[in-house]
Amino acid sequence: MDTYEELSLEASKFIQDLTLYEASKDGLFRVDKGASNNPEFEETKRIFAAKMAKIHLQNQQKNIPDTGTSEGNGSNLQYTYSMPKSVEEVPVTYNGQSSSSVGQSDYKTYRESYKVKPEIDSADSSEEPVIRHEHETMLLSPVSKVGHAIPSQQFTCKKAISPSNESLERERIGSENMHSDLNLSSMINCKPMEKNTPHNKCSPLISSSVIFGEETNTHIPQQKFFNLSSPSSINLQKTSDHVCLSETKAAKEFNGEQRGFCSTNSLNSGSSNDVKLSALSSYCVGYNENSSDQIKQMQAPCYTFNSGHSSADEQPQEIPFSCTDSSAEPPASTLDSDHIDIVQDSSTLMKIKLPCQTLSQSSKQGSSRAEKKLEAITRHLEQEMDAHTRADYFGTCVKCSKGVYGANQACQAMGNLYHNGCFICSACSRKLRGKAFYFVNGKVYCEEDFLYSGFHQSADRCFVCGHWIMDMILQALGKSFHPGCFRCAVCNECLDGVPFTVDMENKIYCVKDYHKILAPKCAACSLPILPSEGTDETIRVVSMDKDYHIDCYRCESCALELNNEDDHRCYPLEGHLFCHNCHLKYLENHNLS
């Protein structure tokens, strides 16, 4: 508890103002933006990290079980993996013996850096070997450059997790390995090296997981998988005849718009005391339709590791694979034994093409649907036009007795309604709307046909001048006029298209002159009673058969305005207008006299 209290006090120094802190890349600390150059802060951070690492190692050592053995008549095989104190040193022990340390700059080859020495009894046994794991293990992954031979291997340490939640980890590893394998760009070339087993071939692994299991000549029995972290994982399994190291890789199915293919190689059975590493991997290669021209192909052969003897009929297997991403280097990890040779057989490498799934073009829909839609729209427009034209109904044509719809189809002449196509010249069938026409004996003629056909002898005469109307005719009051002859009798203004009036003597007047001449005159002021300005209505007062302006209708004695009110009523006497009081006075004076 004292340790944790001390750590909590030191940690509280970092969290004084949360707004000034941001998460660091390693996820262990929170760094003050303003204190990046503070030496005291850096020293405190280093001490805090060292104490956390120390407590972590102490908890790990408490959980490490002692190395045990499996007693019995069968094989005695022990495997112990321990967490190194630093990344520079990766010890792996088998039966108490540790492999040579892996340095940071110069790394030894497979044979020198990683040795597997299992102790297997020759006698048959039914008991299972003791397989021991620690909470965390380290995996050696060779780091190589693409396109160069690998005379000596460089290794990086990758942290693994405990073999719990097997199914969930297998799915997570599969998704991570799938994305890591898509970063391969070109082949890893391996120079052939001839040693004890010249027929064996090896190449750097793409992703690996080690399986220690028992194997017979015909099949592989039950296997216990211990899935580890990405992209490689170590799986252990018991064996009775020999130990087989195989490489597995979990893959998940693609979904969405990507497509892929999987190539899987099975594990071949071998003789006893053999250690094999074969690629049991299913590479899921994503294929993007938009970048199909950027696909590059690459192959990697299968690799087999033999610890001692191998049968003559065993042949290495090769797994060609392809990758779509040509910008990333392939991650690799390799396990080795005493007699591992790295060779390459370029003659057996074959390039394969990615299976492209052609997208079936959906057949274009026939034009029948578009035509039907167009017909429906056309019918709708026709219905709207019909509804609009029916609203502009003018009447019935006197010639064809059919309805006239729309102002552009109506023509009115001589007080009758015609269609434009019905009001035509009787001789040449020319449309006469807006043109001069002649009506002779119930027929209509255009001007040319009337002048040169002799029909003018029977044409109408002008009511004013008495001459034949040879051009346009103006009809009013049942009579025919020349347009120039139809004028006001007072001001002589042409009344063609202007309102006019006629008196009892059939004299034509404009409205203004009619009111001046024919309007009634006021009995009081002797002026004509005209309509108000801007209107055609005339307002007057009639009393004793006389006409008066409204303002002139007053008492002649006191000039009181007379109207229908009680005190303003008119009391005429002897042709004079009087109010009630003046009327009484006039009667009294008349009686006295």
Swiss-Prot record:
Keywords tagged on the record: Cytoplasm, LIM domain, Metal-binding, Nucleus, Repeat, Repressor, Transcription, Transcription regulation, Zinc
GO-annotated biological processes: neural crest cell development
GO cellular component terms listed in the entry, alphabetical order: cytoplasm; nucleus
Record carries keyword Transcription regulation: yes
GO molecular function: metal ion binding; transcription corepressor activity
Keyword set includes Signal: no
Domain of life: Eukaryota
Entry's localization field: Cytoplasm; Nucleus
Annotated ranges, domain LIM zinc-binding: 395-456, 460-520, 521-589
Positions of region (Disordered): 308-336
Main subcellular location of this protein, as a coarse class: cytoplasm
Gene3D superfamilies reported for this sequence: Cysteine Rich Protein
Pfam families: LIM (PF00412)
Family under the similarity heading: Belongs to the zyxin/ajuba family.
Quaternary structure note: Interacts with snai1.
Known function: Acts as a transcriptional corepressor for snai1 and snai2/slug and plays a role in regulating neural crest development.
UniProt name for this protein: LIM domain-containing protein 1
Taxonomic source organism: Xenopus tropicalis (Western clawed frog)
